[in-house]
Amino acid sequence: MGRFISVSFGLLVVFLSLSGAGAGFCCPLGWSSYDLYCYKVFKQEMNWTDAEKFCTEQHTGSHLVSFHSSEEADFVVNMTYPILKLDFVWIGLSNVWNQCNSEWSDGTKLNYKDWSGESECIASKTIENQWWSRSCSRTHYVVCKFQA
């Protein structure tokens, strides 16, 4: 009986360690994962304000995409280009010149930059991993992101 309990406990520990939060994560259906975050491309065009609001309605903690490394930006480019071809997607930066904003719309620190001009809101090209200043009232496609 003692051996059975010991083996059962051992199997339980193995099961819990493999299924626990540290063993991996899953994004909801239709979302792609990268570095503990979930991303989704939406083939809907809207202005920056509506795009940010739209993202917050898609999943708890979701915002317009933020980038914290060139590798992450490359992941998003590789994800968006097959769907949108050569176009722009909104990213979670606005009023960066007028208000000296140093945060993404999700509240994370602006610690990676790839500027290409000045304007109120920033969009990323779906092919070149460059950020372009755009009028916030223009419409672009949307990529949302949240931490898994």
UniProtKB/Swiss-Prot annotation:
Any one of the GO CC terms: extracellular region
Single GO term (MF): toxin activity
Disulfide bonds: C27-C38, C55-C144, C121-C136
Pfam families in the cross-refs: Lectin_C
Protein localization: Secreted
Signal peptide, first to last residue: 1-23
Tissue localization of expression: Expressed by the venom gland.
Ranges of residues in domain C-type lectin: 34-145
Domain of life of the native organism: Eukaryota
List of glycosylated residues: N47, N78
Keywords, alphabetical: Disulfide bond, Glycoprotein, Hemostasis impairing toxin, Secreted, Signal, Toxin
Family: Belongs to the snaclec family.
Protein's job: Interferes with one step of hemostasis (modulation of platelet aggregation, or coagulation cascade, for example).
Record's subunit section: Heteromultimer; disulfide-linked.
Protein name: Snaclec stejaggregin-A subunit beta-3
